[in-house]
Amino acid sequence: MNPYPHLRPLLFCLNPEIAHNLTLQILSRAAVFIPRIKAGNPIHLLGHTFPNRLGLAAGLDKNAVAISAFDRLGFGFIEVGTATPRPQSGNPKPRLFRLPEHQAIINCMGFNNDGVVALCQQVAAVKKRTRALIGINIGKNKLTPNERAADDYLIAMSTAYPYADYLAINISSPNTVGLRDLQHGAALCELLQRLKTERDKLSAVYEKTVPLLVKIAPDNEREQLDEMLSIIEDSGIDGIIATNTTLDKTAVTGHRYADEQGGLSGKPLTEKSTKIIAHIRERLPDLPLIASGGVMSADDYYAKLEAGADLVQIYSGLIYHGPQLIKDCLRMPSPQR
């Protein structure tokens, strides 16, 4: 029996951010009571063996408080964060909106988090008994100007490095002013070069190489996207996560929340993100690629794999469909390529 259809109306009666935080609190306290799901076909990627191809996207468990619960629910990997060097409260509330008619969410959270040190303490407490791999998503603080953004990423990376199975470089959130400017041209080149250089030093110190992946936005013009892909390829960065939320709210025009600031996720992002995955795979056939965006069903999950993704993450789909979506995705066959 799937209880989530009965629980969802109760959760949706609450303010979205309150419901989100309450759910995380319950999961963090009740993890030991969740039956462990052992499902999926392992895949070797990024120097690791992932238990399966399905992961939790960053943003749901920003402070890594419910890793054990998500691990027991069956995820093959869990991406926590976004974590910044210093704690920050994020953007003013309200900043999270549900659009059930569209199976969508708009968020303008603004990297609210307890800081990378606190997150790493949470990861360290559970990592040895966690089956899923753990990715740590890092970003810059709101008050750090773009000219010094690399310093923030370097601080976060060096702090998180011992605890991460991979690190995700978030330069694509629409909710930190100017952040997406780091996706282009000289700014992207410099950032990736500095991160790669520091990663090589950390690899020697810790005697392990933690893969670096860049998380990109879905709103780039094709020429911009191709420029980004060329820079990423030349940089030696290990992979791409595509995509973050979109600023294009055409699909929800007329909804009472359509004009809210922030990024749109969920079903309206499904087709756009899948097309970007296919384009990236065509351009970079061998680069590890994680799909994120608009996975609302097992068919969406499989479509991302068919488009060329190696791994797939969910977030909004979990809000609308609950843990049953995890089971449905893990029942899907591996793609034939």
From Swiss-Prot:
Membrane topology: Peripheral membrane protein
EC id: 1.3.5.2
Record's keyword terms, sorted: Cell membrane, Flavoprotein, FMN, Membrane, Oxidoreductase, Pyrimidine biosynthesis
A Pfam family reported for this protein in Swiss-Prot or TrEMBL: DHO_dh
Listed cofactors: FMN
Active site: S173 (nucleophile)
Cofactor: binding comment: Binds 1 FMN per subunit.
GO CC annotation: cytoplasm; plasma membrane
Cellular localization per UniProt: Cell membrane
Coiled coil regions, renumbered to chain: none
Pathway assignment: Pyrimidine metabolism; UMP biosynthesis via de novo pathway; orotate from (S)-dihydroorotate (quinone route): step 1/1
Positions of substrate binding: K62, N107, C108, M109, G110, F111, N170, N175, N244, T245
GO process terms (BP): 'de novo' pyrimidine nucleobase biosynthetic process; 'de novo' UMP biosynthetic process
Disulfide bond positions: none
Similarity comment: Belongs to the dihydroorotate dehydrogenase family. Type 2 subfamily.
HAMAP family in alphabetical order: DHO_dh_type2 (MF_00225)
Subunit structure, interactors included: Monomer.
UniProt name for this protein: Dihydroorotate dehydrogenase (quinone)
Protein's organism: Dichelobacter nodosus (strain VCS1703A)
Organism placement in taxonomy: Bacteria, Pseudomonadati, Pseudomonadota, Gammaproteobacteria, Cardiobacteriales
